[in-house]
Curated annotation (Swiss-Prot):
Domain RdRp catalytic, residue spans: 501-687
SUPFAM superfamilies per record: DNA/RNA polymerases (SSF56672)
Protein name: RNA-directed RNA polymerase
A GO term for molecular function: nucleotide binding
Cofactor needs: Mg(2+)
EC assignment: 2.7.7.48
GO biological process, one term: viral genome replication
Disulfide pairings: none
Gene Ontology cellular-component terms listed: virion component
Family designation: Belongs to the reoviridae RNA-directed RNA polymerase family.
Pfam families according to UniProt: RdRP_4, Rotavirus_VP1
UniProt keyword list: Magnesium, Nucleotide-binding, Nucleotidyltransferase, RNA-binding, RNA-directed RNA polymerase, Transferase, Viral RNA replication, Virion
Record field: catalytic activity: RNA(n) + a ribonucleoside 5'-triphosphate = RNA(n+1) + diphosphate
Amino acid sequence: MGKYNLILSEYLSFIYNSQSAVQIPIYYSSNSELENRCIEFHSKCLENSKNGLSLKKLFTEYSDVIENATLLSILSYSYDKYNAVERKLVKYAKGKPLEADLTVNELDYENNKITSELFPTAEEYTDSLMDPAILTSLSSNLNAVMFWLEKHENDVAEKLKIYKRRLDLFTIVASTVNKYGVPRHNAKYRYDYEVMKDKPYYLVTWANSSIEMLMSVFSHEDYLIARELIVLSYSNRSTLAKLVSSPMSILVALVDINGTFITNEELELEFSNKYVRAIVPDQTFDELKQMIDNMRKAGLTDIPKMIQDWLVDCSIEKFPLMAKIYSWSFHVGFRKQKMLDAALDQLKTEYTEDVDDEMYREYTMLIRDEVVKMLEEPVKHDDHLLQDSELAGLLSMSSASNGESRQLKFGRKTIFSTKKNMHVMDDMANGRYTPGIIPPVNVDKPIPLGRRDVPGRRTRIIFILPYEYFIAQHAVVEKMLIYAKHTREYAEFYSQSNQLLSYGDVTRFLSNNAMVLYTDVSQWDSSQHNTQPFRKGIIMGLDMLANMTNDARVIQTLNLYKQTQINLMDSYVQIPDGNIIKKIQYGAVASGEKQTKAANSIANLALIKTVLSRISNKHSFVTKIIRVDGDDNYAVLQFNTEVTKQMVQDVSNDVRETYARMNAKVKALVSTVGIEIAKRYIAGGKIFFRAGINLLNNEKRGQSTQWDQAAVLYSNYIVNRLRGFETDREFILTKIMQMTSVAITGSLRLFPSERVLTTNSTFKVFDSEDFIIEYGTTDDEVYIQRAFMSLSSQKSGIADEIAASSTFKNYVSKLSEQLLSSKNNIVSRGIALTEKAKLNSYAPISLEKRRAQISALLTMLQKPVTFKSSKITINDILRDIKPFFTVSEAYLPIQYQKFMPTLPDNVQYIIQCIGSRTYQIEDDGSKSAISRLISKYSVYKPSIEELYKVISLHENEIQLYLISLGIPKIDADTYVGSKIYSQDKYRILESYVYNLMSINYGCYQLFDFNSPDLEKLIRIPFKGKIPAVTFILHLYAKLEVINYAIKNGSWISLFCNYPKSEMIKLWKKMWNITSLRSPYTNANFFQD
């Protein structure tokens, strides 16, 4: 058993280091004799510790248990009241505490003042501006660092340097925290007024960020960056991240391309040895110099010096240091402003009449035409999704807030809730449900607001609109997205592509006679100037579309959509300011509508087209590509002469002048070699991603448990690591120990072992080996997996009560009735389950389930009870396959150049040997014929799990399933009687397995699984025609080979001799695989 259990045991000795502390390991085994020894061992340990005897003798006596059984958990207890943090901290608090400069930030409350100065009384106090929003505490974080430091104080050589660097930085944190005392968190991991009143307001979030940074220090450069950010972020809570990361938008334009990858006709990345020189006008250097001066003004010294040293020769070899600075800047934590300031920010912009009306007209027309183009086909053909738009909206209604708390009755139970789904049910039950009337959002009914916080930018506000807006927009937006899916211009939505494809698109046309224009339009999206032309363009488009059909229901759908736009042109918002709620007329576009992403993309495409059409009057060029990706847009322009400094300068100034004529406050840049947008940046022909995910501070609180957050923490660590920001793995593991431990009583705690946290069960939190997803196949692993499956889903009394009420039942049956033309249990049960699952976002229900889960878990971690189950997991399948494979050594040469320099070496090696992929593997069954058939006639979207169930039914059951969803009998018959149906069986099984094996997550998403280089390492003689079996054998083999290579940096080849007799058995088993949802899979999904 791995490193985790070792560290766990050391950690417990470190934390509970008093005389009265005891650690009792609990073992289990799938072998019944050994299991009995485990039980004996455990009861004797308890006996001895009750009588205050040593456990040493038992460890010898039961060495068979310790050697052969598997560690399940460690029970630890200590009668010491645990103020150990303060005591240990003193040892490190030898430095000079930081003093906050209280004049750095423009807004008074962003200065790191003593809390009672910002909030004189407990009533005025709010933690919302500094809440770390994570279910772990500052004291735990301090403990984790001190544990690491104590464990490594005797390191030698290079490791000693790392120790010294971290110790030095921790001294700053420890001294500052110690000066005021460690803030004690409450049961909800929040910091109350009483605790904070005599301490600096931002102390906790600053200390968390600082710990995250110092535990990510390895090299001397890391140390310099971290030190500077830690010291300055103590005072500067507003602009630091922005200052440090601003230069990147120019740096990418300075590096020559010497060999790069481009997208070829087959949408694959292909190496091109082209050389493109960076042409940089003096003006650009002046702007860069200005940015660096601004950094110095803010007190930065080392970081600007690093940038200036790099500027001497602008080499791609040293560029990773620039990438590192850019990533690190985000780790200073979130900027959390007051709602009032966030809202006023958009309204501060001076509204001028002095704009180019002609350009606005063009912009509006382009939006109109694009909306028409997107919806023309579905409208002309009276698409059923547009006819049944209301039902489609209800089926995908989220359980987010509807903006106000209401009292709702479900049967005899009365509850208060803000959730949309509950409001809809309640309104239907009480005859208040009127989706045909879109409520106004004017001065009489202003919009409540949510918030979005992000490091390095100001807080943005989010509209929380009534659910009628969602229902009105859902179907139309879905149709827009379908159009965007097969339109290359929409980089974000383009069919199954990933960011590597977009990278190859840009580099493809870069040459000595081309330049690329890239613009960050986030300011424009939320500006007042955008709102009228934007909404009007959409309205005009909808008007034109309404004339293309005679179907009353389609016209109604378009009209309701139009009404949402009309209402939003006169929007007011409500902002709590102290005790009063202010109403403000808000004339800008904010997120919160269903259309936000799609409509912004349309508008940004229209914007760049407008600008290009203007500058084409002055310059002659061909537009090779136009792309829009979220808040950014970029275009590659090809000229008929070689690009010169003067040309770049002229185009740049013309572009800026053009934007200015629309009064668009955007950051537009022109370069010949690279771009920088929010999602990715390209420099020297290589692609980089910002590794800026915060680990110890979260944006907001949700209703996830500590286990969920531990999994998210690990997942964030992995993503950062792939992007070039590595945090010490021991530290991450220590955090996982802290966050997954379960308190039994005040002095008694249970710490699950590595086996519990890494086996793919409903409790999985992390992988024992980074980047490698293991599916345990040993007896003990399968045993524990079975044990956990027995307690996977927990009941909730409140949820059952709500689900039994007539309000709920009538709602579900109403949906079923509208959807189905005949009885269909699978779908009806599916809808009921989905609706019931949506109730989980109601806190009392999730709390109730959590409590049940914890108590079941506690029992299980002390003695696993396995159960005989007909359920088969992917582990069972792999366990059957494994014995038939034989391994031999192999050799694969490195044959591809690096194009993603930030990748860890072991992952990079694999891409260099087998190549990368530019597409997502389809894992939701949407490409199957049955899925397409259903979406042709029904608004219902079955999940991959449901398709997997359905496709394995008898043919007549499949027919009934289809007919009940409104598919004509003739189509259903044709489907079942055709070859397509048997292809579907295979295709859906394939999708389902890909889905189970997380093939589109982690680093697996980077590898080309169909690489001929990988294929040639696998030999599986072809026996009998069962494609599904050959598929699973190949996939298993590929994962084995890749996992081995990640771990060992060398290749193996696999030979499989699978007996024909076993094939049919395996094939039958493959139709019974259960999917396991765990905090780990949720965290992966959350990354999306």
